[in-house]
A protein has these predicted regions:
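Structural micro-motif
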Residues: 91-131
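Generic internal hydrophobic packing segments that stabilize the cores of diverse globular domains
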Residues: 60, 64, 107, 111, ...
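GST-like fold's C-terminal all-alpha helical module
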Residues: 118, 122-125, 133, 138-256
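Local sequence-structure signature of Cys/Sec-based thiol-disulfide redox active-site neighborhoods
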Residues: 35-89, 227-231, 247, 251
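N-terminal regions that are enriched for targeting/export leaders
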Residues: 1-43, 47
Length: 256
């Protein structure tokens, strides 16, 4: 799989599976935080931060949903890459419907933004990316953390007085997000990219066991973490909404 190695684009540098054939997801590399504190390293400010996404990506989708539900469209701008990722990686294709140019720097490829943030970066070029236009760098490329920042750091600029990480349910939200990540959110990829039959069987079994579990949970309560809509529901939704169209066939998640 394609990636940057010491800042150079390589098309043969990343194996998607480990020695046992199991899908091996690289951890997100940029993990700074935007905070409501004006004295923070990355203080929340309207118009300062920019979000790079692909509509094809469930991880990016969850940040877009949180941004929209909070009413942050005017506070955090967005650029949308081409959903078809070729050998050159995520590309800006403004001529394609639903895609945009890079509104910050006019880059041709998302990897150029990674190279700006770290000229010696080694790793995969992924979405979403939260960009600081003032410091000209990546703040964060971990979707769960970007969701949390949008929900907790930008209230001053949100047009909707809602939270998806409510007091009194935070432990339940964190537990639900952790519980669905490996078997469901990442599980569809573990099935689709498995390099051995054993790795595939393990992934698809855990996936459908988890779906059965959460169906039982939702038989007794309205949402995953209790009576209110939270980040956990958004995280589950972006996988489920793609299940029939993509994962059932393309990723072989078709046990049922």
């Amino acid at each position: 799989m394609n990636m940057l190695v010491d800042g150079e684009w390589r098309t043969d540098a990343y194996e998607t599976t480990d020695e046992e054939g199991a899908f091996d997801r690289q951890e997100s590399a940029f993990r700074d935080w935007v905070e409501a504190d004006p004295d923070a390293e990355f203080p929340a400010e309207a118009g300062r931060y920019h979000l790079y996404v692909s509509y094809a990506c469930p991880w990016a989708h969850r940040t877009l949903i949180t941004r929209a539900l909070k009413g942050l469209e005017d506070a955090v701008s967005v650029s949308v890459v081409d959903p078809y990722r070729e050998d050159e990686g995520w590309e800006f294709s403004p001529e394609r419907e639903g895609c945009t140019a890079d509104a910050v720097a006019g880059a041709d490829y998302l990897r150029e933004r990674y190279q700006t943030a770290d000229p010696r970066f080694t790793g995969r070029v992924t979405v979403p990316v939260l960009w600081d236009t003032e410091r000209d760098t990546i703040v964060n490329n971990e979707s769960e953390e970007i969701m949390r920042m949008f929900d907790t750091a930008f209230d001053e600029y949100a047009t909707r007085d809602v939270t998806f990480y409510p007091e009194g349910y935070r432990d339940a939200v964190d537990d639900a997000i952790d519980a669905i990540y490996e078997p469901v959110n990442n599980g569809v990829y573990r099935a689709g990219f498995a390099g051995t039959q054993a790795a595939y069987e393990e992934a698809v079994t855990e996936l459908f066991d988890a779906l059965d579990h959460w169906e039982d949970v939702l038989a007794d309560q309205r949402y995953l973490a209790g009576p209110v809509l939270t980040e956990a529901d958004v995280a589950m939704f972006v996988t489920l909404v793609r299940f029939d169209a993509v994962y059932h066939t393309h990723f072989k998640c078709n046990r049922r």
